[in-house]
Amino acid sequence: MISQINNEERDYKLEAYDYFLDPSLIASKPSAIRHESRLMIVRNSVLEEDCLTNKFTKNLLDEFREGDLVVVNNTKVMKARLKVELENRTLVELLVLERSDECVWLCLAKPAKKLKINRKLKLKSPSEQDINLMVDGVDEETGGRFIKFPENITDLNSMNNLLDKYGEIPLPPYIKNSEEESFHENSYQTEYAINPGAVAAPTAGLHLSKSLISNLKKKGVIILPITLHVGYGTFKPIDQEDLTNLKLHKEWVSVNKEVVEEIKRIKKTDRRIIAIGTTSVRALESCYSHEINDFIPIAKYVDLVIKPGYKFRVVDGLLTNFHLPKSSLLLLVSAMIGRERLLDLYKKAIKEKFRFFSYGDAMYISPDSLLEKNRFKL
């Protein structure tokens, strides 16, 4: 059926964002040196060399210009995966997502069917005191469980303190290796992660080493942080075929006054704003206010959907990973350079054995490749 409709209509069909990936190209480990991961550089499609595949992320030093604003997401992945014990000593896994009410937190559970309402759980650790929990309800939207924690676990800080003692880093299920937990505690965090609250890493930032960041600053590149706590919705599969009225998850975003003022200055010049990761794109684009037609600081949950047809107001370029088929992240990148071109680039990446997903290689969408029709004229 999809083959019988035009390309613009196909942009709004989930099936049009599917592709085949050999499982051997799914990265289970990161590059040994962050800035040595491979980099595909995407340029304007009219250029003879519209795609470079022989680069590494350290070559971003040649791509970014003096005066460019590079925006990073400084969220930190919490040890949000907990193993709890039922009365019969059966183990169940929880993934803590967000606070629901007072000391009640929404968690995904595996296997969820064992967690009936009012069932008691015990959180155990070899070096810590046992903690009693209870199932308080069922969330119809996610299929998760509302779990009642001790009365003092009422905010993100107190929960993060508990998770630091009892939890583990929640790696995506496709990362299968025998590395120690301590390995992922470092490798699955960006070098600038300081604000705990995410349940998944903003993975494009994993490519930026301390030395690369230092060299970019020496060149005159401005690097500023935003915070977007990556939530469950980032990796939740899209469950509707028609994307016309797509609604996505909410995520907590903070963009401060310093970043907003820099955006306003840059938009009056020929300087550029480059986002490190799709989460930074979502945060930056969310700070535009339609009511006053201007950029404003924000600290709130946002549910912005970026898909083909979206007009970018803030972002000019993007460093990103290679994303899962049929994902909201694939829609976002397609909004920048077009779905067909993006899928052609993915075919090229697969042919040249680039590594995919969270620990994989990177793609840099240079500002000259962003389609003019997708830029909002301020």
From Swiss-Prot:
GO terms for biological process: queuosine biosynthetic process; tRNA wobble guanine modification. Pathway: tRNA modification; tRNA-queuosine biosynthesis. GO terms for cellular component: cytoplasm. Keywords: Cytoplasm, Queuosine biosynthesis, S-adenosyl-L-methionine, Transferase. Coiled coil: none annotated. InterPro entries: QueA (IPR003699), QueA_dom1 (IPR042118), QueA_dom2 (IPR042119), QueA_sf (IPR036100). The keyword Transmembrane helix does not apply. SUPFAM superfamilies: QueA-like. Belongs to the QueA family. Transfers and isomerizes the ribose moiety from AdoMet to the 7-aminomethyl group of 7-deazaguanine (preQ1-tRNA) to give epoxyqueuosine (oQ-tRNA). This is S-adenosylmethionine:tRNA ribosyltransferase-isomerase. It comes from Prochlorococcus marinus (strain MIT 9312).
